[in-house]
């Protein structure tokens, strides 16, 4: 794609939720869920059915989205710094999509949960509020109460719940930017549906008294074949602690209610684009920073490399494309977001690991043997894992030795077994595939070793992940 003339540059809207299970949207086949605006976006654009977050936890995933770098390259995650959370290096931030677009003349705005800090010589780092033309972001987890989010206080009276306030922020920025005719990039990171469970009371009746079918892999008996290491993180305990086992309908009703408010905000944003007369040149991307187990396999929360945790929604609406209401089945990942935005806005290829998804507008094309890493080096070391997705296969390696455990691996054929019910690691029928995947894994570890950021956490992990077992 050639460099675009300034007048041809599209507006970019990037919308990201927090902890959204792929089965929570109508366009992904969720029964009993009401998401008309997001489904409308899908109907007008392309739905990506095999999109993964390379690290299924918010801080690392958000840094990857912004930069196109894997976690072991950018080093941003909880507790991965020398004396606290890993801060993003200034050199990496300068190459993030918001900074590159601003340097290219885009008007930039951010609202919501930013998720990480930029290194500035202090222990805590800085949030980049001065790096955007308009800022509605916040540190930490932010709050569902708008008045508690300092940069969003002006919306508190009319929109007391934060989710709709972000819709209002987006609406106002879009309308103001459209007046000046300058291309813009608006990024909104919703807190929803992240815990604590505080849905907007305006929508209490949406799912009141409703029941929801459980996925076919729901419950502990469908996770017995998982590694013992996977049960050493807090995800296993949260199946009980968060009441998926005994109050599933109530828990999911509130979860879906949080997402319904996001859908309302998406509607506000799309209406603003249309009302401003810029719908023909405004690209919209919708995704989540990670998935959510919601009781599948007897787990709660996220982090682990299984489908419910690592595979997330991705919808791209590009008015320049003739493709509408189509689906892409190629394997894609959050490392591709920055490359896609920069390609769409500037017509420039990226030097990062990510790939532009513009070519996937032709959904009949296949992508070949691309390998998407799935990384977890957060939480207890017992639950550390490294895996990847390649074509229909997923390979996971659990390196921890001790407490009666030894290194183990899992292989799933996602085409035949999308619910990950059958570990094929000892299946002689896939012996050749196993050898191929093990070689791919070994190369992935070597790549980590060669390109890891110079921080002890990631250097140590390199040694840990060399295969010692099956």
Which residues fall in each region the model found?
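Short hydrophobic beta-strand that contains or immediately precedes a catalytic carboxylate
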Residues: 411-412
């Amino acid at each position: 794609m050639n460099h675009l003339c300034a007048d041809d540059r599209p507006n970019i809207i990037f919308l990201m939720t927090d902890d959204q299970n792929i089965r929570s949207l109508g366009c992904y086949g969720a029964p009993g869920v009401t998401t008309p605006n997001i489904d409308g976006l899908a109907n007008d654009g392309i739905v990506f059915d095999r999109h993964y977050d390379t690290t299924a936890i918010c801080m690392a995933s958000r840094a990857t989205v912004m930069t196109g770098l894997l976690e072991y390259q950018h080093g941003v995650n909880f507790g991965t710094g020398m004396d606290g959370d890993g801060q993003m290096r200034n050199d990496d931030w300068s190459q993030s999509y918001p900074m590159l677009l601003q340097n290219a003349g885009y008007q930039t705005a951010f609202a919501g949960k930013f998720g990480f800090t930029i290194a500035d010589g202090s222990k805590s780092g800085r949030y980049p509020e001065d790096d955007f033309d308009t800022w509605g972001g916040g540190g930490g987890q932010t709050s569902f109460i708008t008045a508690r989010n300092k940069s969003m206080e002006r919306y508190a009276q009319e929109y007391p719940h934060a989710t709709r306030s972000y819709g209002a922020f987006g609406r106002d920025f879009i309308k103001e930017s459209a007046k000046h005719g300058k291309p813009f990039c608006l990024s909104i990171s919703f807190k929803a549906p992240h815990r604590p469970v505080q849905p907007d009371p305006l929508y209490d009746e949406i799912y009141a008294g409703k029941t929801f079918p459980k996925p076919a892999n729901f419950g502990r008996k469908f996770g017995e074949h998982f590694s013992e290491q996977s049960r050493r993180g807090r995800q296993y305990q949260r199946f009980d602690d968060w009441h998926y086992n005994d109050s599933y309908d109530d828990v999911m009703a509130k979860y879906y209610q949080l997402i319904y408010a996001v859908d309302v905000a998406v509607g506000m944003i799309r209406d603003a684009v249309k009302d401003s007369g810029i719908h023909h040149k405004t690209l919209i991307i919708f995704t989540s920073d990670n998935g959510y187990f919601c009781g599948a396999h007897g787990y709660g929360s996220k982090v682990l490399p299984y489908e419910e945790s690592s595979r997330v929604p991705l919808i791209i609406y590009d008015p320049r494309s003739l493709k509408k209401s189509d689906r892409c089945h190629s394997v894609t990942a959050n490392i591709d977001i920055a490359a896609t935005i920069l390609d769409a806005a500037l017509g420039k290829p990226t030097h990062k690991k990510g790939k532009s998804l513009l070519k996937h507008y032709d959904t009949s094309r296949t992508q070949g043997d691309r390998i998407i890493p799935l990384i977890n080096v957060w939480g207890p070391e017992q639950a550390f894992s490294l895996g990847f997705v390649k074509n229909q296969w997923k390979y996971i390696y659990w390196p921890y030795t001790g407490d009666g455990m030894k290194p183990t691996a899992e292989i799933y054929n996602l085409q035949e077994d999308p619910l990950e019910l059958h570990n094929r690691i000892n299946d002689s029928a896939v012996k050749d595939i196993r050898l191929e995947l093990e070689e791919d894994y070994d190369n992935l570890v070597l790549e980590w070793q060669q390109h890891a950021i110079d921080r002890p956490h990631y250097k140590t992990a390199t040694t840990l992940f060399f295969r010692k077992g099956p």
